[in-house]
């Protein structure tokens, strides 16, 4: 059982991975709950009884770094470089890139003010950031984190809308694959919304496999 409580200026968010965990944490005014569980009909029924709404289904993603035969260097069409996570452009891009992502929209109905506070917290905690640059402008970023002993995880990534079709996202993800291989990782992992077909297609292009579905439920008080 995991209960993570995060306090923001205007509200408190509890992230829970067990449907029984909430009972040990009394509700307060301005408290939002986000529960993520393995996809199963019983879990869905139980959470609905508790007053939660189904918000999203996420999928685990993995790119094997030992089996792939793709030439990822040929997929990189933009300049990719390390960047200070505190660069203001990173926060700006993040704030404009997730209009409905349930990692950040923790209210049953999307709320830009609330999601903005959650996004700011996420960006503040980024550690190993790479940016995509076009004519001196940062047009996208990707944060790469250790994942277990042998893998890496794409913790957060976003690209300015007008550069997505131009290959900026592919360049960032291909660079992440090469970076993970240089670190000696066996797999590059991620977790995405099953409704995000653009990112799903991007991962598929890079040879990823999908599995481990998890359902996201939210409730507010």
Where are these regions (language model features)?
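Conserved active-site alpha-helix within GNAT-family acetyltransferase domains
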Residues: 40-54, 170, 194-212
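Catalytic cores of nucleotide-enabled group-transfer and carboxylate-activating enzymes in metabolic
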Residues: 124, 130-132, 174, 181, ...
């Amino acid at each position: 059982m995991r209960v993570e409580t995060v306090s923001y200026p205007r509200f408190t968010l509890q992230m829970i991975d067990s449907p029984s965990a909430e009972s040990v944490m009394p509700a307060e005014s301005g408290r939002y709950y986000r529960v993520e569980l393995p996809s199963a009909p019983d879990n869905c029924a139980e959470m609905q009884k508790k007053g939660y709404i189904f918000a999203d289904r996420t999928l685990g993603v993995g790119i094997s770094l030992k089996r792939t035969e793709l030439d990822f260097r040929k997929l990189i069409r933009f300049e990719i470089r390390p960047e200070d996570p505190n660069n203001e452009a990173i926060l700006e891009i993040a704030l404009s890139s997730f209009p409905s992502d349930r990692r950040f929209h923790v209210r049953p109905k999307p709320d830009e003010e609330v999601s903005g506070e959650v996004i700011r917290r996420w960006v503040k905690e980024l550690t190993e950031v790479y940016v995509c640059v076009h004519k001196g402008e940062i047009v996208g970023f990707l944060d790469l984190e250790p994942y277990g002993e042998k893998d890496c995880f794409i913790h957060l990534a976003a690209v300015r809308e007008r550069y997505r079709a131009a290959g900026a996202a592919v360049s960032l993800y291909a660079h992440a694959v090469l970076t993970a291989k240089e670190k000696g990782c066996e797999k590059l992992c991620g977790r995405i919304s099953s409704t995000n077909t653009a990112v799903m297609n991007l991962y598929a292009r890079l040879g990823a496999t999908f599995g481990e579905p998890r359902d996201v439920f939210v409730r507010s008080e």
